[in-house]
Design a protein with these regions (language model features):
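Conserved hydrophobic/aromatic pocket- or pore-lining residues that grip, position, or stack substrates
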Residues: 14, 47, 57, 72, ...
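Glycine-rich His-Gly loop
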Residues: 6, 73-77, 160, 240
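Exposed loop/turn and edge beta-strand positions of beta-sandwich/beta-sheet ligand-binding modules
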Residues: 41, 53, 68, 150-152, ...
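Non-catalytic accessory segments flanking enzyme active sites
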Residues: 1-63, 83, 89-92, 96
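Short substrate-entry loop that stabilizes the transition state in hydrolases
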Residues: 65-68, 73-117
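Extracellular/periplasmic ectodomains of large secreted or surface enzymes and adhesion receptors
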Residues: 19, 32-51, 55, 59, ...
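Glycine/Thr-rich phosphate-binding loops of Rossmann-like dinucleotide-binding domains
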Residues: 11-12, 24, 81-82, 112, ...
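Active-site-proximal cap/loop segments of hydrolase catalytic domains
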Residues: 104-310
Length: 310
């Protein structure tokens, strides 16, 4: 039997289970260089939403120095939680850049049985992708700011649904986030429903309508492309040109619409990349650009210096 073992500090290792000796024999590492690095460890943070719902997230602090700010890192799905039992390159890299990174398990997260993140908790996020779920994210970040030394500025970042929410956060919570990094996101519900690669499969239409909703007024209100006038802070858009899950065409349309506004934004397209960046050179380039972008945001006055004061 071959076993795969991973952790926040180990990218991945392969073992062979020897049935005769009842021992696991090491075979190889996914990336020996990463395994030699001293990486940060995650801390569980429990907080309560403004409506009394108990929530939880994971906080990763820089290994040295005072954090330059707090990155509210939003997981994809969205109906699956962030769990720190495997290596998360984005979160570790952001921490190495000097940022505190918080990954909230907001309403709608699921995938952990019938407990805190079970089916009921998952269903609590249905049709609220751009509303209550975003409020849970902000309230988690505010709790972290109030209880940990994480700096004055707060950024929102994520991929897939995390990309969408990082765009919609700039609409719904434009008084809070200092900038946003949007990776492989979508920007309009109708466009996503009609173009994503899962359309046409048995039961998919019913599922999508159940989790996203069908009210045209609500879907428009929760679509960033229809609310560009509310975006006040800088945003960065990153997308692969052959993304079929959150189609590239949606990102292009969003950028075209942004060009007609005064929003401070930049965008980066990657050839031969799909839903996320997987070629090493592109992934490396992505984080260099993100680092530069956040450094430029760091030079701006924070939106909420009083929120971060302790």
């Amino acid at each position: 039997i071959m076993l795969y073992v991973g952790s926040p500090g180990i990218l991945g290792e392969y073992y062979i289970w020897e049935q005769t000796t009842k021992q696991a024999r090491y075979i190889a590492s996914v990336h020996e260089a990463v395994d030699q690095l001293e990486l940060g460890s995650f801390k569980s943070v429990k907080y309560m939403a403004s409506d009394g719902v108990k929530l939880q997230g994971w906080l990763l602090m820089p290994r040295s120095g005072k954090p330059k700010g707090l990155v509210n890192y939003i997981h994809g799905g969205p109906h699956g939680p962030t769990i720190p039992y495997d290596y998360n390159s984005r979160m570790q890299i952001m921490a190495e850049m000097g940022y505190a990174v918080f990954a909230p398990n907001f309403r709608g997260s699921g995938g952990m049985g019938s407990g805190s993140f079970g089916d009921n908790f998952t269903r609590a996020g249905f049709t609220k992708w751009g509303t209550r779920m975003l409020d849970d994210m902000r309230e988690g970040a505010e709790f972290v700011q109030a209880n940990y030394e994480v700096g004055e500025r707060v950024y929102t970042m994520g991929g897939s649904y995390g990309g969408y929410s990082s765009a919609q956060n700039m609409v719904r919570h434009n008084d809070y986030y200092d900038c946003s990094v949007i990776i492989a996101g979508f920007f309009e519900f109708d466009q996503l429903k009609n173009k994503w690669d899962g359309r046409g499969r048995a039961g998919t239409s019913d599922y999508v309508n159940t989790v996203m909703g069908t009210d045209p007024i609500e879907l428009t209100a929760q679509s960033p492309i229809h609310n560009l006038d509310k975006i006040k802070s800088p945003i960065m858009i990153i997308h692969g040109k052959v993304d079929l899950r959150t189609p590239f065409d949606g990102a292009k349309r969003f950028v075209a619409a942004l060009k007609k506004t005064d929003v401070d934004f930049e965008y980066h397209w990657y050839n031969h990349e799909g839903h996320g960046l997987y070629f090493n050179k592109n992934s490396s380039d992505q984080f260099k650009k993100v680092n530069r972008f956040l450094n430029s945001c760091d030079s701006r006055p924070p939106l909420n210096p009083k929120v971060a004061s302790r």
